[in-house]
């Protein structure tokens, strides 16, 4: 196994730069640069030298094999944050036979060495890309191994049910028993119900992980772009009295009280002889249909498009008068805070339905498991036992206990180099 290294901190100038090593030569390499560092898991200030060249004075620490994140020998060198120092250290490490780590290779080694399961690795990737508090909390549940523990619990029940069925076959007076033990059937029903519940929460979990989209739709000159600018508190969209100014969909990524929300400013909905504007309108209609929530904005408060349950109808340009409760003014800000309250309340309800399964790969594994368990209770015991084995294997694959090879490159390539 190669010993690898990479900067664990972002490249560029900063207060501190951390270089991480992992592999069988990590400790020996550290001592070749810093002198004896005998005590693991204890930081020490050392001069780093490559021959007669003093590279830097750094805080160093190492972890013994089996007691590190990767499961291998690991060393960390906390340097001063000038890029030239990390570059000079890299030269010294390459000269000692180490190689630069690939993206996500430290985490991949942690998985291969049994330090984390695949769901925890996916959770770590989500944590590193989290932009809001809700996403952070969701990712932390995954990194703490909740999904892996749930999968193991369900597998244990299936294994118990399978053992009861196998025992009924092995010790039956007849060649093949006619009935499946009642305890086994109860366990199968309980597992099937749990998996169906996990699958039911997948869409909400996936949306929270990816972020919600809220489309602002309505006729031309309804104030959609002005509203987007007001929400973003900066000029994002060009505002003009000329109808049809907005043609492309403009996006505003926001943290709405911990929820990841992207507001979409769309082209004004109308029939147009201008082919470019017509394309913009068509895209607006499609994107609005795909959005999680729609704000129907118009001067008269009458929506242009068919309503979907949960949509919000708002009369714009409240600064012009008429003082209705559902009116807003993107120009003055009147009613915008109340509108954002309403958007948050709508999305918060959906976020509350989130669970443990937030990745397509995980959901597909659960679908295979529940399909294997979609069996008639009157099925012959030997066939039922085989169905249980298939379901248990699908659960094991969900967290990478078996058959994870096809997913490794895709999952770990999303990490940064030093993770």
From Swiss-Prot:
The TrmE-type G domain, residue ranges: 211-348
A cellular-component GO term for this protein: cytoplasm
Residues annotated for K(+) binding in this entry: 221, 240, 242, 245
Residues that coordinate or bind (6S)-5-formyl-5,6,7,8-tetrahydrofolate: 20, 76, 115, 419
Stretch forming the signal peptide: none
Subcellular location as annotated: Cytoplasm
Single GO term (MF): GTP binding
GO biological process, one term: tRNA methylation
Pfam families (UniProt xref): MMR_HSR1 (PF01926), MnmE_helical (PF12631), TrmE_N (PF10396)
Protein's UniProt keywords contain Iron-sulfur: no
Family to which the UniProt record says this protein belongs: Belongs to the TRAFAC class TrmE-Era-EngA-EngB-Septin-like GTPase superfamily. TrmE GTPase family.
Subunit-structure text: Homodimer. Heterotetramer of two MnmE and two MnmG subunits.
Protein name per UniProt: tRNA modification GTPase MnmE
